[in-house]
Amino acid sequence: LGVIRHMCDRVGVLYAGALVEQGTTADILSNPQHPYTVGLLRCIPRGGLHKNTDRLETIPGSPPSLGLHFDGCVFASRCSLADDRCRTEKPEMVTVGPSHVARCFHHDKAPSMARNIEGASQGLSNPNKRPAPAGDLLNINNLSKIFAQDGNKVQVVNDVSLFVKPGETLGLVGESGSGKTTIAKMILGLTSAETTSVMTLSGKKLARALNKRSVEDVGALQIVFQNPDQALNRRHSVTRIVSRAVERLSGFNRTESDNRAHELLSGMRVDASLHNARPAQLSGGLKQRVAISRAFAGSPNLVVCDEPTSALDVSVQATILNLLVDLQKQDDTSYLFISHDLGVVRYISDRIAVLYLGRVMELGNAETVFNGPHHPYTEALVSSVPAIDGSQRVRIRLEGDVPSPANPPTGCVLNPRCPRMAGSGVEGLCTTVEPELKEVEPGHFMRCHIPFDQLRTTQA
């Protein structure tokens, strides 16, 4: 929606195949007049909201199946303003402003309609909950990965060291090709890390390859993929998809596993009437709930969330994020959360690691990383996020493309694109010596030769 704000002149809002509102971009995003549009905009995790203090708003209910016949308004079943007229009579488009129309009998009440903030989910019963360690849950040291490409060695992850505490969310951000997913795959054992890499879970060393790990370790580390269509077996029912994971990770028999699967699905608010459905019969949001249910089949300590909401609309995204937060609070589950959506990462993360060309460039508490002073690369990332309210921030542009890891720049890997190097007084260092990741203030780390106080001054 932020991109739409900056790229489009006019916007049309569709629901259940019907155009429910249309107008200039400024009118639609700043003065919405249809309850559905109002609800969509309220679902967005805007700056300043955080899981520890704020629950995301959602739109109640679920979208109807396409092709259904409606006697009245297509949104009536989910609308807090709906009355008998809305359910029996189809509203026409009415003019609500210059070049602004809405299909609603109560458009004048829409901007001030009651907010919908659902209570916490009922949660998941967890008979096999693992005790949380006293220290770090996950600790990775000198994590590296080298691939062979055309006879050459290409290092795509370079000596990354991170930790995740029990009940904490560590966000991973960075441009495509920065190494986020490769790091996640190495943690999960799907890709073998280099022999110099050391990973421990609850103080116990993790084997680098998945087939060398115990069932206990596999159950303790799970993943929610970006695309549930590819992650769920379309030949199995929803219940069987989850129960197979329960059987493998918990040792239950078929009946016990099916019962546990029903508990997990119900805890994720998948209605019992859908437990025997196939994935193709479910919406994208419901598929992702099934995928999350499966990830929790083995009572994991840490779940890798690899772009888990990128394929979902903002209303479904808000519901999924709320459910993830509920599960985390219930069992102290930790998340490694990968996303290009910085608003989502800021909302759900406790700490954030910013990656570039396989290296951690900045690491710190979520608000510290977003509020600055920033590493120059983080500064550029944050400035590139289009604001939905139309406000204009100074855009810090990175020149050129991300260099190939097969031929990384000498010195700091960001130096050919760095927006702060020129005039910094340390250009010689930047182009010849790779900086170390150093603590610039308590709990805040940067990989940069430019003095921290100088960054603070130039970014003020």
For the regions a protein language model found, what residue spans apply to each?
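Conserved ABC ATPase signature
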Residues: 278-282, 286
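P-loop NTP-binding/switch modules centered on Walker-like glycine-rich loops
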Residues: 1-54, 308, 312, 316-393
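ABC ATPase NBD Q-loop/coupling interface
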Residues: 198-216, 369
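Short catalytic/signature loops enriched in Gly
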Residues: 24-136, 366-460
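Conserved ABC ATPase "signature" region
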Residues: 41, 256-273, 382-383
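A short, proline-enriched helix->beta-strand linker immediately N-terminal to the Walker B motif
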Residues: 297-301
